[in-house]
Amino acid sequence: MGRGSFIMRILILGAGKMGSFFVDLLSFDHEVAALDSDPQRLRFLYNTQRFTSLDEVDAFDPELVINAVSLKYTLQVFDKLLPHIGKNCILSDISSVKTGFKEYYEQTGHRYVSSHPMFGPTFANLGDLSRENAILISEGDYMGRIFFRDLYTRLGLNLKEISFAEHDETMSYSLSIPFVSTFVFSAVMKHQDTPGTTFKRHMKIARGVLSEDDTLLREILFNPHTKPKVEMIRAELKQLIQIIDDRDEDAMTQYLTRIRKNIQE
C-alpha cells in the first residue's frame, strides 16, 4: 500500500490545508479523488478527481477514505458518506482530538484506521519533515495501519503508536498547554517598538498559532483532558505570584530549579 505497491482508490474528504497536503502526497502513487462542497477549494488540486457532491463518490468506489475536515464535522461527514461507499472501504481520520471515535467506528461495521500528523503548514517545512512527529492509533485495521505506517515513515516522520485514550491525554500536554500559554501571552500583549529577542520569538509563535482556523483552536481547547491542564497553569501562576509578592529569593531559586528539570531532554 504505497510506493512500489498496488494502486488504491483513495478519497480525501475536505480540500483544506491538510486535505490538499494528502492529495499532493498520494496522487502520483494512487488513484485519488477529493471531495469538498466548496469548488473554490478544489481549484488548485492536480492529478486528482474533484468532487463537490457525495453522489459522485458512488462510481469512484473508494477503498480508503481519509477524512480531513475539521473535527466539528468529521463524524457528520462520515454519516453522510456511508451510504455511498462499499462495506470493504477503510475509514480513516487525521483528527487532533479523538474522543468517541473508537465507539463510532465500531458501530459503522467498517474497517478503520486513525492517525494524527503532528504538524501543519503554518510551522512545518513540508519539504523536510524529519523533525516532525505523527501518531498512529494502535487500534483498528491492521492493513490500514500498515498503509499509514509506511506513508509516514517514507516522509521521515517520527512515528509513535498509542491507543485512542492515550492520544487525547497526550494532546492535552503537547497542544493544549502551548496553545493556552500562547493565548495568555497574546491577551496581555502591548505593542513594543524595541522588542528583545525572547519577545520576538514568542510573538512569532503567537502569530503562527493564532493564524490557525478558529475551529482547530476550539478542537484543541475543548479536548476533555484540557481543563485539568489549564487548572495546573493557573495553580503555577498563583504560586509564582506569591513568590513575587513575598520577594522570596530562596523560593524563586527552588522554583527555577524545579521548572528547569521539567524541560531537560
Annotate the PLM regions:
Residues 40-47, 59-60, 102-108:
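Short loop/helix-cap segments at secondary-structure boundaries that form the rim of catalytic
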Residues 97, 101, 105-158:
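Rossmann-fold dinucleotide-binding core
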Residues 6-51, 56:
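NAD(P)+-binding Rossmann beta1-loop-alpha1 motif at the extreme N-terminus of oxidoreductases
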Residues 68-70, 95, 138:
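Glycine-rich, N-terminal phosphate-binding loop of Rossmann-like dinucleotide-binding domains
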Residues 56-82:
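Rossmann-like NAD(P)-binding element
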Residues 85-101:
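ADP-ribose/adenylate-binding Rossmann-like module
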Residues 161-265:
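An accessory alpha-helical subdomain
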